[in-house]
A protein has these predicted regions:
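Soluble non-transmembrane domains of integral membrane proteins
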Residues: 1-207
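Helix-loop-helix
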Residues: 58, 71-93, 147, 162-165, ...
Length: 339
């Protein structure tokens, strides 16, 4: 991160050198400085031991007698390789279900996936006042949350020189008057996809916890699981309780299915008799079966349809279980069994 300067600036910068270190019980700050004949740039990086946020502030001072044209920028890079441990059979590793790659949140789309293949073909560029960008992994992410009051340009591209992919933010153009200074700040998040932590940085950052296309079902399930965890203090039992809750909610559908299957079992002898009687005439057998269903008030579809209607709920719950970092290595019972 830093500043992009116009042609009127001497680009012969010294390398960043540490100038100051400040430590306290809640924040550790490190100040780095570099300068050229025209400008002096300071970078202040602040860490808080209790969370995963990094606050970065850049200060630029014009040392010349000319106006300097500049823009701020911040970016993160990665290669195209999958993180260690994500290779293997599709059904063998939950990480293979997770989206790994760049994400942008802007005013036009608060959660937009732009995979590495797309950046191979075309750069991403979009103006927005609010938003963030990140690289996602299965349980972790690295995100840039810029100033939310000015227009920024969110960018993503592949560097053809080093074959690395980058996402970042470029600030609006500014003019720095002679012997004056300006600054810009942004936040970084390096850590697990813990929704309660992500929401502290940006209201849309919890969307990085990706429960797939059934997010609208999965998110309430996670909130229910969080509620039960707060009650019992154990994620394993929270999963059991959510499973029971889902079964209770879906019981009317299950009841219809079980009732229909019970009726089908009762008329099995009659169906078998019809099949033997009309074994040589499929049309007659079909008509006889339809008449039997009507007389006995049996709908064969009611045995399968309610089960199909329940599938999205169980699929969404599966996505929640494999995508929630709080469950990673969490003890189930007496700390002897881990999820």
């Amino acid at each position: 991160s830093g500043f992009v300067f116009g042609n009127n600036v001497n680009q012969d910068f010294s390398s960043f050198k540490i100038e100051d270190i400040k430590r306290s019980s809640d924040t550790n700050s490190y100040t780095f400085v570099r300068e050229s004949a025209s400008v002096k740039e300071s970078k202040i990086i602040s860490f808080q031991p209790e969370n995963y946020f990094v606050e970065v502030k850049h200060i630029i001072r014009n040392l010349s007698s000319e106006v300097i044209n500049s823009s701020s920028y911040s970016k993160i890079e990665r290669n195209s390789l999958k993180p260690p441990g994500t290779e293997g059979a599709f059904f063998g590793d939950p990480a293979n279900f997770a989206y790994l790659g760049p994400v942008f949140s802007t005013e036009s789309d608060n959660y937009q996936k732009v995979n590495l293949g797309e950046l191979e073909e075309n750069d991403f560029k979009e103006n927005s006042i609010k938003g963030w960008t990140a690289f996602l992994e299965h349980y972790f992410l690295t995100a840039i949350i810029p100033d939310q009051e000015n227009i920024n340009v969110f960018v993503g591209k592949k560097n053809k020189t080093n074959e690395k992919f980058s996402v970042g933010v470029v600030g609006r153009p500014i003019k720095i008057q002679p012997f004056e200074e300006t600054s810009f700040s942004y936040s970084l998040y390096f850590g697990p996809k813990v929704q309660s932590e992500l929401s502290k940085a940006n209201q849309d950052l919890p969307l990085a916890v990706d429960y797939g296309f059934l997010y609208w079902i999965g998110q309430p399930m996670f909130l229910a699981m969080q509620f039960f965890y707060d009650m019992v203090g154990n994620w394993g039992w929270a999963i059991v309780l959510v499973t029971l809750l889902i079964k209770v909610i879906l019981w009317p559908l299950s009841y219809v299915s079980y009732k229909s299957m019970g009726k089908m079992r009762q008329i099995q002898p009659q169906l078998k008799d019809l099949q033997e009687r009309h074994s040589g005439d499929r049309q007659a057998m079909s008509q006889a079966m339809m008449k039997l269903y009507k007389d006995e008030k049996v709908n064969p579809a009611l045995g399968c349809l309610p089960m199909l209607l329940q599938m999205p709920f169980f699929l969404a719950f599966y996505w929640v279980l494999i995508g929630t970092v709080e469950l990673r290595y969490a003890p189930f019972m007496l700390s002897l069994i881990h999820i």
